[in-house]
């Protein structure tokens, strides 16, 4: 018999621990293979035995997040973090937590856990790449450079790593190091570039030249080196336009104007429709101020490129002789009208904007003379498009009757062209007839139901006319409406900012209309007889709901815009690595520049300014708390203490009816799936107790961090800081406004008067801040304002404003009107002054001010 060799038995705890770790590693592999449910099953088995197994808690949170159970995922991750002392967990646990935080877009936390994974002994060098990506996302380029370098050291065989290191060095101002990095790889890859890699190689060569050019600045020797490098790489570069433009710029900096002009002529030959090249050619030839030489130049260029616009158009911008200019205008405009070019007016509109007094009467005479010689039957194409041109001409001059006359002539002749309906609607819009304008566009839309442009234009006009239901109906013809009654959800999904902002503004206007009607009904209720009071009470309840609904929906739609822009910002995350893999460093740097000004884009700023009206009003209403004001947020009218059972029963019945109505109406206004949105009407938004904090978080903070000083809206800054009690910042905004627009501006006067009155003893602002602002006003503007009259209640500030700043600055007057409760100005007199100053404005602007501002 053989004797069994005796072995020392392993402790049970160690066996269990090894089994647990094996199970965890298996669960981790399943997660990596996207088999989340199987991974969860293994993790549940581990946690059943040891509920404090931190690695399993973290991985389970990540698994749950991956299957969509985000609330449970957050709970497990929070539990795991609670059990960790500081960041002293296993490298795998820290890595898992880093991935989870990245998925939830908590980038700073993700960086913390990825760093912890490396500090705790992780050998996974891929973490450096993820770390660099996240650091780039939050703008921490200094640490991103460290991470890029570590990753590059670990994986030297990939060009993307060399490119990403060079980009990181460039962004951190280490330009020579970036050049050296790119040059080093070029030496290693010399003669080994395959056809599929040639584009990437071309981009990296041009990127290297970009860095050299930035580093050279105006140094002549360095610029010569940049030029030499450009000539050396020219055969390998695909972007010939970029290369030639750079070459011409360097020649200009070196003073080699003749060489620069040759390059610009080459660029014009390659793309004769680019206006920029012609203007730069003028500069390189040194003839910008010599109209005679410019005329000769463009005469020759027109012969070389007879079918191109710039040589024909540019002389129209500088010719001074009336007869010569008239001749050139005739040669430029009439052939287009003969061919029936719809964009003829658009082509010459820059001339109207820059040389209105000289060009406008000449073109009017030329085109009217041309029209008088046309036969509508024999020359139908020139006839209709000449009328179309003249209608646009008179619309630009704000001669609306004549504009209507000519577009009607075109429509009477050919009522089947959509462009004519669009122009007629524009004219009616300027006249303030929004309902009629929308109706005209609807007629035009019916002519071509497959045209998305006319569809969107019609939607926009219906929204401007406050006909939201019809606008949504028309917009929904081009949306996916699989799981909803209209296209609202799809328009949010595709981030159609133009529609959402227009709809928000329409809701805001409806809110103002209903609020005004509600105030009128409340006043009427006190005056009418008892037999009519019940009907009025019902009308009040109806309007209360509509006020609340429109206000909430307006704010809801405005708040959708920053969500889109946050998504745009988050979308950059993938490109921090994608652009390096694809070898497009120049495009990547353009994206970084775009991201730095993301929250200053026109649509975002427009939504922010409109939303500020609601947030500021909510803040002001909250502060007033007048006992005699009608509370628009309540669901029912106060019943003077009567609490009979019949009234309670009635109230209960009304509440049930309202809930049913909300359910019905929610289907047509819901912007998101029901499981993602529990506040369809935005009621929680308008019930906030912190409107200014909400405005700052949603809009203002991002805007304020990114906006350039020369683009900043100082009025918005002033109003925001005024409401949060930061008078010193209000003065700073006033001061900057004065430097940009002068101290004669009506808006400057209005802002200063409001700020002056904020320093009175009876205002709720900080006494120290009031003293600081008073001293600042005395120092800077003592000659502009009667500062000693600030405590004089009988002083006529409106008369002072009128004498000092005039009475025609409508924006300044409207600003004063908004703060009429804070400044002792007779609101009726101010209102009369505003109305009397409306005459220079277009009818639609007059209507808007009368209806929504006063």
Curated annotation (Swiss-Prot):
Description of post-translational modifications: The N-terminus is blocked.
A GO MF label: ribosome binding
Primary location class: cytoplasm
Residue numbers bearing the N-acetylserine modification: 2
The TPR repeat ranges on this chain: 20-53, 54-87, 91-124, 126-162, 241-274, 384-417, 452-485, 728-761
Disulfide bonds: none
UniProt entry tagged with the keyword Acetylation: yes
Subcellular location: Cytoplasm
Top-level taxon: Eukaryota
Sections of the chain in a coiled coil: 623-667
Function of the molecule: Non-catalytic component of the NatA N-terminal acetyltransferase, which catalyzes acetylation of proteins beginning with Met-Ser, Met-Gly and Met-Ala. N-acetylation plays a role in normal eukaryotic translation and processing, protect against proteolytic degradation and protein turnover. NAT1 anchors ARD1 and NAT5 to the ribosome and may present the N termini of nascent polypeptides for acetylation.
Other remarks on this protein: Present with 7600 molecules/cell in log phase SD medium.
Protein's name in the database: N-terminal acetyltransferase A complex subunit NAT1
Record organism: Saccharomyces cerevisiae (strain ATCC 204508 / S288c)
Gene: NAT1
């Amino acid at each position: 018999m053989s004797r069994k060799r005796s072995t020392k038995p392993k402790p049970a705890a160690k066996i269990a621990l090894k089994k647990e770790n094996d199970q965890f590693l298996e669960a981790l592999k399943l997660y990596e293979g996207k088999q989340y449910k199987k991974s969860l099953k293994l993790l549940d088995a581990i946690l059943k035995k040891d509920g404090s197994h931190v690695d399993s808690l973290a991985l389970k949170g990540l698994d749950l997040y991956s299957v969509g159970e985000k609330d449970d995922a957050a709970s497990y991750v929070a539990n795991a973090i609670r059990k960790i002392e500081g960041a002293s967990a296993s490298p795998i646990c820290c890595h898992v937590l880093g991935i989870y935080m990245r998925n939830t877009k908590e980038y700073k936390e993700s960086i913390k856990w990825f760093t912890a994974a490396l500090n705790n002994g992780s050998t996974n060098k891929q973490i450096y790449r993820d770390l660099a990506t996240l650091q780039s996302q939050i703008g921490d380029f200094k640490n991103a450079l460290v991470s890029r370098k570590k990753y590059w050291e670990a994986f030297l065989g990939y060009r993307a790593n060399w490119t990403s290191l060079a980009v990181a060095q460039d962004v951190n101002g280490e330009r020579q190091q970036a050049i050296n990095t790119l040059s080093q790889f070029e030496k290693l890859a010399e003669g080994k570039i395959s056809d599929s890699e040639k584009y990437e190689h071309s981009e990296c060569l041009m990127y290297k030249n970009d860095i050299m050019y930035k580093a050279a600045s105006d140094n002549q020797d360095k610029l010569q080196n940049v030029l030499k490098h450009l000539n050396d790489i020219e055969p390998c570069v695909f972007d010939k336009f970029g290369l030639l433009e750079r070459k011409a710029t360097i020649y200009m900096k070196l003073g080699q104007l003749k060489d620069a002009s040759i390059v610009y002529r080459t660029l014009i030959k390659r793309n004769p429709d680019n206006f920029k090249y012609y203007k730069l050619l003028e500069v390189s030839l040194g003839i910008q101020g010599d109209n005679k030489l410019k005329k000769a130049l463009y005469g020759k260029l027109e012969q070389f490129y007879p079918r191109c616009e710039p040589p024909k158009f540019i002389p129209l911008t500088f010719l001074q002789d009336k007869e010569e200019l008239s001749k050139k205008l005739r040669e430029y405009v009439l052939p287009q009208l003969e061919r029936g070019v719809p964009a003829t007016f658009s082509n010459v509109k820059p001339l109207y904007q820059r040389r209105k007094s000289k060009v406008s009467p000449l073109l009017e005479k030329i085109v009217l003379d041309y029209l008088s010689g046309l036969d509508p039957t024999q020359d139908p194409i020139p006839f209709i498009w000449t009328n179309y041109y003249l209608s646009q001409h008179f619309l630009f001059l704000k001669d609306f009757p004549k504009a209507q006359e000519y577009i009607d002539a075109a429509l009477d002749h050919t009522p089947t062209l959509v462009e004519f309906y669009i122009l007629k609607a524009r004219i009616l819009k300027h006249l303030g007839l929004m309902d009629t304008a929308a109706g005209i566009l609807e007629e035009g839309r019916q002519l071509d139901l497959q045209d998305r442009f006319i569809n969107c234009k019609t939607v926009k006009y219906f929204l401007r006319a406050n006909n939201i239901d019809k606008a949504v109906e028309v917009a929904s013809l081009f949306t996916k409406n699989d799981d909803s009654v209209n296209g609202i959800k799809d328009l949010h999904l595709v981030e159609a900012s133009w529609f959402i902002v227009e709809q928000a503004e329409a809701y805001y206007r409806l809110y103002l209309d209903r609020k005004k009607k509600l105030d009128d009904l409340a006043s009427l209720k006190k005056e009418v007889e008892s037999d009519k009071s019940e009907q009025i009470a019902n009308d009040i309840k109806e309007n209360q709901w509509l006020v609340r609904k429109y206000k909430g929906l307006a704010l809801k739609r405005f708040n959708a815009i920053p969500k889109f822009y946050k998504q745009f910002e988050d979308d950059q995350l993938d490109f921090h690595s994608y652009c390096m893999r694809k070898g497009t460093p120049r495009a990547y740097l353009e994206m970084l520049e775009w991201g730095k000004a993301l929250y200053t884009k026109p649509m975002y700023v427009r939504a922010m300014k409109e939303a500020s009206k609601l947030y500021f009003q909510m803040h002001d209403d909250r502060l007033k708390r007048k006992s005699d004001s009608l509370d628009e947020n309540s669901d029912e009218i106060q019943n003077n203490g009567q609490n009979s059972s019949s009234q309670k029963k009635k109230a209960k019945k009304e509440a049930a009816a309202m809930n049913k109505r909300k359910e019905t109406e929610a289907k047509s206004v819901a912007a998101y799936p029901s499981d993602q949105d529990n506040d369809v009407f935005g009621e929680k938004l308008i019930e906030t107790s912190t409107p200014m904090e909400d405005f700052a978080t949603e809009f203002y903070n991002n805007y304020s961090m990114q906006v350039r000083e020369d683009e900043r809206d100082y009025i918005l800054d002033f109003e925001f800081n005024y409401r949060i009690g930061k008078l010193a910042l209000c003065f700073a905004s006033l001061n900057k406004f004065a430097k940009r627009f002068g101290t004669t501006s009506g808006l400057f006067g209005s802002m200063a008067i409001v700020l002056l009155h904020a320093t009175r003893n009876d205002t709720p602002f900080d006494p120290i801040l009031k003293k600081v602002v008073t001293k600042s006003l005395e120092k800077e503007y003592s000659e502009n304002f009667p500062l000693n009259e600030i405590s004089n209640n009988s002083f006529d500030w409106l008369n002072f404003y009128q004498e000092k700043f005039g009475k025609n600055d409508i924006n300044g007057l409207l600003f004063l009107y908004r703060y009429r409760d804070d400044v002792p100005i007779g609101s009726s007199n101010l209102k009369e002054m505003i109305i009397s100053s409306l005459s220079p404005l277009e009818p639609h602007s007059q209507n808007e001010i009368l209806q929504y501002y006063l």
